[in-house]
């Protein structure tokens, strides 16, 4: 009797184990022909610009590897062309389309209205929809550190800063850079003149060259630039005129290891991978701004290559300030109006 009972219990346990294994298999292994998640990225520039476009491309590739999804991308898409590129991805079954260009906003919103079952994301967006979210990389903190560096390194007591257009996430870079220059200069007991400019474009190499050339004519010897093609031109001018250059948008040191002494990296790789992860786990929501900061731990960071040329005291002071930002004991104001800080 006991033997029969034991046998029955063993049989029941085996059946339960087999059932659980079968359930787990079908719950975790995609059925043949099941839908593959497709994510597209539309870039305004080159995937190898060491800036805004490349960092986003690397985020897409990181997400592809991490989540085993199907991805595609298109480079050099100007705003007038963005609508056709976006709609082509919609027709091809892409479920998340990231348009990495604020200036393509109108094309994004128009497509979102016609394809309500597809999610769209674009940077620095305030005009959102139920299927449109935006991501914001705030670099006021890293730009403040760049300002400290410029003030500490300049021998002429003249520095320059330029960017593309006056949108909040870019304006805050210029204003915080100026604040960092002024406060570090005051700490060092000197006065530093600041020259600033907006080029009106992200990609025009000549405009970046002209900005740095103009600053150099005023004897500025350290320049901070934020952009893609405009920074390629800015770095070329920095080489020509012997100016130290602080990159922006991505880590641009590899483009000119001699002249690029630091970069305010906007953290596009981590940011884009995070946005895709949110979409895949069901937490990405329309009508939401996803914001990333140095203190937030995902996205922006300050890439440093100046230890061999900067005074030890300056290096230490910048490191202390960065740590204070990270642990929350120092807050850098987020100025989004041009002229908030006098040059």
Regions found by a protein language model. Name each.
Residues 2-6, 31-343:
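A residue-level marker of the well-folded mature domains of exported/periplasmic proteins
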Residues 1-34:
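Secretory targeting signatures
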């Amino acid at each position: 009797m006991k033997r029969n009972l034991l046998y029955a219990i063993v049989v029941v346990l085996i059946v339960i184990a087999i059932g659980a294994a079968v359930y787990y298999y079908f719950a975790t292994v995609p059925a043949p022909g099941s839908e593959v998640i497709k994510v597209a990225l539309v870039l305004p520039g080159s995937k190898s610009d060491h800036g805004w476009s490349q960092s986003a491309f690397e985020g897409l590739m990181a997400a592809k590897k991490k989540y085993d999804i199907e991805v595609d991308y298109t480079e050099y898409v100007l705003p007038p062309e963005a609508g056709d590129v976006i709609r082509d991805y919609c027709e091809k079954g892409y479920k998340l389309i990231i348009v990495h260009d604020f200036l393509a906003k109108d094309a994004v919103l128009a497509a979102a209205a016609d394809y309500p079952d597809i999610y769209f994301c674009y940077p620095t967006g305030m005009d959102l929809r139920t299927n449109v979210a935006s991501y914001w990389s705030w670099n006021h903190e890293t730009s403040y550190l760049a300002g400290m560096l410029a003030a500490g390194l300049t021998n002429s007591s003249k520095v320059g800063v330029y960017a593309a257009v006056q949108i909040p996430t870019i304006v805050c870079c210029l204003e915080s850079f100026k604040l960092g220059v002024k406060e570090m200069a005051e700490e060092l007991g000197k006065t530093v003149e600041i020259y600033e400019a907006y080029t009106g474009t992200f990609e025009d190499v000549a405009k970046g060259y002209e900005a740095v050339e103009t600053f150099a004519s005023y004897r500025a010897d350290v320049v901070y630039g934020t952009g893609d093609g405009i920074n390629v031109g800015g770095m070329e001018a920095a080489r020509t005129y012997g100016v130290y250059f602080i990159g922006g948008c991505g880590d641009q040191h590899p483009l000119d290891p001699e002249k690029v002494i630091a970069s305010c990296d906007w953290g596009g790789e981590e940011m884009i991978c995070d946005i895709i992860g949110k979409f895949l786990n069901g937490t990405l929501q329309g009508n939401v701004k996803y914001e990333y900061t140095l203190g937030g731990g995902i996205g922006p960071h300050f890439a440093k290559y100046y230890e061999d040329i900067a005074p030890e005291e300056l290096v230490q002071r910048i490191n202390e300030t960065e740590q204070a930002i990270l642990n929350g004991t120092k807050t850098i104001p987020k100025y989004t109006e041009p002229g908030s800080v006098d040059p």
